[in-house]
Amino acid sequence: MNLTLFATEGFGLNFNLFETNILNWAVVVFGLYKFLPGFLGKMLQKRREGILLELKDAEDRLLNATQALEKAKKDLSSAEEKASQIKADSLKRSESIRMESEKKAIEEMARIKQSAISDESSEASRAISQLRKEAVELAIKKALDSLPNRLDKTTQENLVTQSINNIEVN
């Protein structure tokens, strides 16, 4: 009887052990059962170790990055504090320089004013001195011009005697 005819007409099982390759399947399944867990287990174990190593490396990098970020934040806040301190110091310094410049300008203006007053005073003093000198010269000239008319011989002798007495007293 031909069993393959029955198989074409529907579902059927072939129970002939040598025709169905059940032995081959059994050997393959047994081999897979026996050797595959060790082979695949080693591959999966290596893969698992690689993944765990990569995870640990990623965690270490994350930790380092977090620490670097914290340090950078501290450095930034320190730099901001230093910048604000420098700004405050520069404002104080510029204010003191401005005040010093104003003080020097006021002192210079006072000195210039005093110099102008001094120049004006000395000029006035020179003018007064010149006027006095001219007045004295004019008075002496006038006195000398009027003296010959007013002095006679006795008055002149009395004047000379009086001048000599004044010199002896001193």
Curated annotation (Swiss-Prot):
Intracellular or extracellular location(s): Cellular thylakoid membrane
Role, per record: F(1)F(0) ATP synthase produces ATP from ADP in the presence of a proton or sodium gradient. F-type ATPases consist of two structural domains, F(1) containing the extramembraneous catalytic core and F(0) containing the membrane proton channel, linked together by a central stalk and a peripheral stalk. During catalysis, ATP synthesis in the catalytic domain of F(1) is coupled via a rotary mechanism of the central stalk subunits to proton translocation.
Signal sequence residues: none
Keywords noted in UniProt: ATP synthesis, CF(0), Hydrogen ion transport, Ion transport, Membrane, Thylakoid, Transmembrane, Transmembrane helix, Transport
GO cellular component, one term: proton-transporting ATP synthase complex
PANTHER family in the record: ATP SYNTHASE SUBUNIT B, CHLOROPLASTIC (PTHR34264:SF3)
Topology with respect to the bilayer: Single-pass membrane protein
Region of interest (Disordered), residue spans: 72-98
Transmembrane feature ranges: 22-41
GO molecular function: proton-transporting ATP synthase activity, rotational mechanism
CDD domains reported in the protein's UniProt record: ATP-synt_Fo_b
Entry keyword Transmembrane: yes
InterPro entries: ATP_synth_b/b'su_bac/chlpt (IPR002146)
Keyword Nucleus: no
Subunit structure comment from the entry: F-type ATPases have 2 components, F(1) - the catalytic core - and F(0) - the membrane proton channel. F(1) has five subunits: alpha(3), beta(3), gamma(1), delta(1), epsilon(1). F(0) has four main subunits: a(1), b(1), b'(1) and c(10-14). The alpha and beta chains form an alternating ring which encloses part of the gamma chain. F(1) is attached to F(0) by a central stalk formed by the gamma and epsilon chains, while a peripheral stalk is formed by the delta, b and b' chains.
One Pfam family named in its UniProt record: ATP-synt_B
Similarity comment text for this entry: Belongs to the ATPase B chain family.
Name of the featured protein: ATP synthase subunit b
